[in-house]
A protein has these predicted regions:
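All-alpha prenyltransferase/terpene-synthase fold signal
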Residues: 1-324
Length: 324
């Protein structure tokens, strides 16, 4: 059994060794640039961890794990373009270094490369893996569209938001685990339990992100807090604040949502103060714990020893208590 840290080192080394020797360089240089940015690599690590529950040698799953990471970075590349984001992981985004058209085309190439890497799995698993991967990719598009639609709405409900983050974030974590389990020879029941584990962990993970954007320590978080507040992003925090606010609090919240000329620090302080008075931090923590517990319940019934599941149990605890 490998630790999550050991698996991270292995997949980082494998990705660093990738050579994109095809031309033109203008298409492939941005791909190499995006993959060189690093990141948590949580999705390929989860795939390797699920595989490692059943098999000791994880090298046979390096290509599919690379595929899931290339796919994830493709979505980030296009997200950055849609959001007009200037930075990603402390570096300039592809459309800033090159241009919009290059970002679109290199992103498209990454999607194709992701499918090529994913298809490098045993023939007996190929259809199941590719069917799940394709469904997941489509669901992520659905989640992204929901998120974009929410920008134009002021009546987003909790259940809609949770469904959006399930599609936009959770399904790829869940698929990473299920694909790893299938390739490792898990039973259909275990593969589905690990999928449920990833699904619930993903929702809890996103809720933690929502929380950290308001209450994170800037020095630890690595970026300024309050970004979601400044752009009126429909997070769990804002949705629950609007739901539980009294008349005066609702008026103040709506003022800060609609005002266009404001001091950023003042807006963050005012909205955070409203969140504190309304009590949304506790509401978010409770919902996060609910999904965390569901994830652990699914992991508990996976039919391998507790010792072999220890790293997954440790990982979800680290994600829930992280400060970044």
């Amino acid at each position: 059994m490998f630790t999550a840290s050991e698996l991270l080192d292995k997949i980082n080394s494998h990705i660093a060794d990738l050579q994109f020797e095809r031309t033109p360089k203008g298409l492939y240089d941005p791909v190499a640039y995006v993959l060189s940015m690093g990141g948590k690599r949580i999705r390929p690590v989860l795939m390797l961890m699920a595989y490692n529950l059943y098999k000791e040698d994880v090298r046979p799953v390096f290509s599919p794990a690379t595929g899931i990471e290339v796919y994830h970075n493709y979505t980030l590349l296009h997200d950055d373009l849609m959001d007009r984001a200037d930075k990603r992981r402390g570096k300039e985004t592809v459309h800033k270094v090159w241009n919009d058209n290059t970002a679109i085309l290199s992103g498209d190439a990454m999607l194709v490369l992701a499918y090529q890497f994913m298809a490098e799995c045993p023939a007996e698993h190929l259809k199941a893996v590719m069917d799940l991967f394709s469904l997941t990719a489509l669901e992520i598009c659905e989640g992204q569209q929901m998120d974009m639609d929410f920008e134009q709405r002021s009546d987003v409900k909790e259940e809609e938001y949770l469904e959006m983050i399930r599609l936009k974030t959770s399904v790829l974590l869940a698929a990473s685990l299920k694909i790893g389990a299938l390739l490792g020879g898990a039973s259909a029941e275990d593969a589905e339990r690990l999928y449920d584990f990833g699904m619930n962990m993903g929702v809890a993970f996103q809720l933690k992100d929502d929380l950290l954007d308001v209450y994170g320590d800037t020095a630890v978080f690595g970026k300024n807090i309050g970004g979601d507040i400044l752009c009126n992003k429909k997070t769990y925090m804002l949705i629950k604040a609007l739901e539980h606010a009294d008349k005066e609090q609702a008026t103040q919240l709506k003022h800060w949502i609609t005002v266009t000329d404001f001091d950023p620090a003042e807006k963050i302080e005012a909205v955070t103060g409203l969140y504190n008075r309304i009590g949304v931090k506790l509401l978010c923590e409770n919902k996060m714990s609910e999904y965390n517990n569901k994830a652990l319940e699914s992991l508990a019934v996976v039919n391998v020893t507790a010792e072999r599941k220890r790293e997954l149990d440790k990982l979800i605890k680290e994600l829930m208590y992280r400060e970044v």
